[in-house]
Swiss-Prot record:
This is Serine--tRNA ligase. It comes from Clostridium kluyveri (strain ATCC 8527 / DSM 555 / NBRC 12016 / NCIMB 10680 / K1). Homodimer. The tRNA molecule binds across the dimer. One of its GO terms (biological process) is seryl-tRNA aminoacylation. The gene is serS. Consists of two distinct domains, a catalytic core and a N-terminal extension that is involved in tRNA binding. L-serine binds at residues 233-235, 287, 387. Pathway: Aminoacyl-tRNA biosynthesis; selenocysteinyl-tRNA(Sec) biosynthesis; L-seryl-tRNA(Sec) from L-serine and tRNA(Sec): step 1/1. The lineage of its organism: Bacteria, Bacillati, Bacillota, Clostridia, Eubacteriales. It is an enzyme of class 6 (ligase). Pfam families: Seryl_tRNA_N, tRNA-synt_2b. GO terms for cellular component: cytoplasm. PROSITE patterns: AA_TRNA_LIGASE_II.
Length: 426
């Protein structure tokens, strides 16, 4: 959520920034929220004046009664003042609801460092690591490799649950588990994150807090007859961990790593990545979440991105980092990097991690602040997160980049201890 004061002080600049995002966004609601805010502030002035008058009348009534006089006229007048205050309170409640409705639907403002552009083709490549994998044979797609090795079962996944569901079996399930353990060990032992195991269901308030709702409700799985949602990412429960709390400045930055299943309806992805395990309704992911002071947050974003890169480097899979342009930025981020791994069957890089700084956008929605000292006024923190990284896409990248001409797949060196010393899946 944006700072309403920021909108009030410079509505035209806010509209310009939102227009630059390329969002399908009705700019007139900025004028609407400014108008509502002005009306609210005028009413608050009136209410304050009425409360002062009520206090004065109350004191005068007490004085008259102590003197044995008749204060009936003042009592009637004070009752009318109280009734007026109640009416204003009703108006204020209605205006506050309207303001909140609008504010929850206004996206974040891009950081000045975000590149111009509207499509993913406008994203700016920052760096690459390793050259794309070359083969002396025609490489297969990961769905064919997994099916041939009997480690991925798409047909039975479809039978049991429907499209975009997959059974991992045998060494496929072992590989997934190995990757999770490797990622968690690396981030906790090498990068200093605290591991946290979150709930897989959250309430509506939590989904609103991180920005999934109200805009993306059609992409969420809601539990029938209840206002719980299956989490689309561990970002939701972990960011809400400190909701309505004031943290100590000396404790920041705080870093968590969380493994969870993730559930997404993929309502806007019809026809995209229909084969394989790149885009599933249920998938596993290791998530990195940080809470930082404003002056720390962009340094922490670089560190978070490097942390996600490190685990991919350990697997020796070619990747690149791109800075996301304004039109591809998403609803909540102020600046975002994508890490994309090389996928031979696609003959291109495919996203495996997004690393974002939300500045105070989420913190205002979930009400997380910090104090440098107990006497200081609380300030909103900055929140950051990134995939550290997606497990299913890692499996796909390993199958494609480590495949051999006989149909087998070599196991990355760093995963061998987690795979019982095995060197190959065949």
């Amino acid at each position: 959520m944006l700072d309403l004061k920021r909108i009030r002080n410079n509505p035209e600049e806010i509209k310009k920034q939102l227009l630059n995002r390329g969002e399908d966004f009705e700019l007139s609601i900025i004028d609407k929220v400014v108008s509502l805010d002005e009306k609210r502030r005028k009413i608050l002035v009136e209410v304050e004046a009425l409360k002062n008058k009520r206090n004065q009348d109350s004191g005068e009534i007490a004085k008259i009664k102590r003197a044995g006089g008749n204060a009936d006229t003042l009592v009637v007048e004070m009752k009318q003042v109280s009734d007026n205050i109640k009416q204003y309170d009703i108006q204020l409640s209605e205006i506050n609801d309207k303001i909140e409705y609008i504010m929850l639907r206004i996206p974040n403002i891009p950081n000045p460092a975000v590149p111009e552009g509207k499509l993913d083709e406008d994203n700016v490549e920052i760096r690459r690591w390793m050259e794309p994998t070359k083969f002396k044979f025609q490489p297969k797609a990961h769905w064919d490799i997994g099916t041939n090795l009997n480690i991925l079962d798409f047909e039975r996944g479809g039978k049991v649950a429907g499209s975009r569901f997959t059974f991992y079996r045998g060494l496929g399930a072992r590989l997934e588990r190995a990757i999770v353990s490797y990622y968690l060990d690396f981030h906790t032992e090498k990068h200093g994150y605290e591991e946290i195991l979150p709930p897989y269901m959250v309430n509506r308030t939590s989904m609103i807090g991180t920005g999934q709702l109200p805009k993306f409700e059609e992409d969420a799985f809601r539990v029938a007859n209840n206002d719980f949602f299956l989490i689309p990412t561990a970002e939701v429960p972990v960011t809400n961990f400190y909701r309505n709390e004031v943290l100590k400045g000396e404790d920041l930055p705080i870093k968590y790593v969380a493994y969870s299943a993730c559930f997404r309806a993929e309502a806007g992805s019809a026809g995209r990545d229909t084969r394989g395990i790149i885009r599933q309704h249920q998938f596993n992911k290791v998530e990195l979440v940080k809470f930082a002071k404003p002056e720390q947050s962009y340094d922490e974003l670089e560190k978070l991105t490097n942390d996600a890169e490190d685990v991919i480097k350990g697997l020796k899979i070619p990747y690149r980092v791109v800075k996301i342009c304004k039109g591809d930025l998403g609803f909540t981020a102020a600046l975002k990097y994508d890490i994309e791994v090389w996928m031979p069957s696609y003959n291109r890089y495919v996203e495996i991690s997004s690393c974002s700084n939300f500045e105070d956008f989420q913190a205002r929605r979930v009400n997380i602040k910090y104090k440098e000292t107990p006497k200081d006024k609380p300030k909103y923190i900055h929140t950051l997160n990134g995939s550290g990284v997606a497990i299913g896409r890692t499996v796909a990248a390993i199958l494609e980049n480590y495949q051999q001409d006989d149909g087998s797949v070599l196991i990355p060196e760093i995963l061998k201890p987690y795979m019982g010393g095995r060197e190959v899946i065949k």
